[in-house]
A protein has these predicted regions:
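Catalytic phosphate/metal-binding cores of nucleic-acid and nucleotide-processing enzymes, i.e., regions
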Residues: 3-132
Length: 132
């Protein structure tokens, strides 16, 4: 057996704003939770997945300075996640922001609506279809 496959990674890399939270980001301390996504994260956590949150929050505000984001933004993020009982194993700040008219392209990506409505098997089939 291939040594790299001995420990199969089961990780979800999840965006924060507009995915785990609802869209209104005028006050990050009071932003509404997306309960459907949070419930699904708990489900995947129970299946043994690691939950890694990756966010572009405040990348414009601090002009990409991750050190300032770690000081000023990360404590607000962890407090909000804990208050809303969001499972997470890691938080990665400094995700490049695509702008208002750009978007992210990834061959293993699913949209929040697909994540909440599809089974793990359906999601895997969706991703496998991208590789064909």
């Amino acid at each position: 057996q291939n040594a790299s496959r001995t420990h199969i990674m089961k990780k979800l890399i999840v965006d924060l704003d507009g995915t785990i939270t609802k869209g209104d980001t005028s006050d990050y301390r009071k932003v509404s939770p997306n309960l459907d996504v949070i419930d699904k994260l708990r489900f995947y956590k129970s299946l043994g997945y690691e939950v890694i949150i990756q966010t572009a929050r405040n990348m414009r505000t601090y002009e990409g300075n991750v050190g300032k984001i770690n000081i000023h933004t990360l404590p607000i993020i962890t407090e909000w996640l804990d208050q809303n009982e969001v499972p997470y194993d890691e938080i990665h700040v400094g995700k490049p922001w695509c702008g208002f008219e750009g978007f992210y392209v990834d061959d293993r990506a699913v949209r929040p609506s697909e994540f909440t409505q599809m089974t793990p098997e359906e999601i895997e089939e969706l991703i496998a279809g991208e590789r064909r």
